[in-house]
């Protein structure tokens, strides 16, 4: 019998879509959009629809596996859990619990995925990952400037006179914002896209401005310099609601507009156009993630924040420096789920440098890695070093629903349930403010189990099973307990399917910022407290002609690795045959200079690694620019991260994935 159920998308994405899922005789057969969702309105992308394929795939992991003599063999849950618990017990008795590394990412936005922290805190505390390969630099940057990274509600864009989409290809990664762009353009708003690549979002724009990769912060600084010279800054905001603007003005005096133009590879006309735009608010600015994946990435976001603030576009309807929206995640009582007070010790490795830190760790060395919600061998920079790190560690465990590149490398693989096989609530701290309920629709395939069951069973074996003596409903109610006064309850979520969270739709409208000064900080005291310079700086990408001329001569092209169109990072690649090859997008000047055409096979290389792929000439892109979509599996040509840089960004919390020079030649 066929039945349609409300559900939600778990993927790490801006849009967090509402679903209608069809179940026939205990099997998920179709995933559609929920037309009653107030933001996503029934429209979903192929990545969401593919969750049906992933759930029913014959390649699903269905049984616990152990590697013996280089081959995986099926074992029982009892054996798997006993042996993993034995190793955890041995480490606790003979070493320190920080000899265990919990390597995790954000493959699933379910609230109960946080129960892994409950387990590791109950164990005593382990080595945890801090920072983010995705958006860490920008989140940290906005915490320095505003106190938090808060975004405007999706519908506030209808109050904007102008919209600037800066480094975010919303047609690929934020489809419901793209819909709103179409609508506000019809109502008379202008749309400007700033990006090194002329993408489908740029086709919608009234104006497209190409900027040299990694120099977006310099562009924002140049526009701010023009604004100051025009006398068009918002002096009331600057004098009453900010600190440190004099530092900005003094720095900008040291760089001429001619130097800004040369380094950003833009024009004076473009600078004047943008300055006039920002002075003619309200202007909403939507920032993407790629431009903060450089050594100077945090500074890039800070300069755009500074431009938005100084032009008077903070705290007003139709304005905003929209990057993340972490007020969504802050709404939940996560510490009731994670119990951080149980930790007796801790150690942290950077998300970006975790491989190097595993290889060099001492007192204690890493003896065990447990991977959840991630695929570090594909997604973490410098793939070859990640492989070395995993191969060095005595025991490695992956908890996943498919045999990823990382799982292939591990000693144990534990099969986990997929989104429609377990109950949870879902949200995203990136865009809209609705939380959604996803009930269990079908039974897990084979012997797959929910993550919470796995943690519960391990906890029982290690003597703290009482931490997991709660039902799924009780855990969900814990997470929602902070919202009871707002009538956001599990009962109402089950009834409605989705509910709005009580967050601001226009952040900072009271000009009460969460910085130490209570004001917008052009010079950040929080940065200084953390040991960084608080003043804005004009730094350049580490792998660039401006910083390392010799390296740029050896490897003349900038490599970007943007999000794929049809896969959420690496998750969908094995299910879509058309994705299963490496496509090398090159700017027209590279094609002309090397006599390359679509379909030509090339080798891309630098000192970290190399890979092969087939050329696709971009119609319009900044000179000397190459893109290879991230997420590709080794079986289909390997991850672009064989080439990428594994250093930390300027504020220590983000990746430098795009700070990457390469060479290219015909294969």
From Swiss-Prot:
GO terms for molecular function: iron-sulfur cluster binding; metal ion binding; molybdopterin cofactor binding; oxidoreductase activity. The keyword Metal-binding applies. The keyword DNA-binding does not apply. Keywords: Iron, Iron-sulfur, Metal-binding, Molybdenum, Oxidoreductase. Residues 2-59 form the 4Fe-4S Mo/W bis-MGD-type domain. Its cofactor is Mo-bis(molybdopterin guanine dinucleotide). Binds 1 molybdenum-bis(molybdopterin guanine dinucleotide) (Mo-bis-MGD) cofactor per subunit. It is an enzyme of class 1 (oxidoreductase). It holds the Pfam family Molydop_binding. [4Fe-4S] cluster binds at residues 9, 13, 17, 45. Its EC number is 1.-.-.-. PANTHER family: OXIDOREDUCTASE YYAE-RELATED (PTHR43742:SF6), TRIMETHYLAMINE-N-OXIDE REDUCTASE (PTHR43742). Belongs to the prokaryotic molybdopterin-containing oxidoreductase family. This is Probable oxidoreductase YyaE.
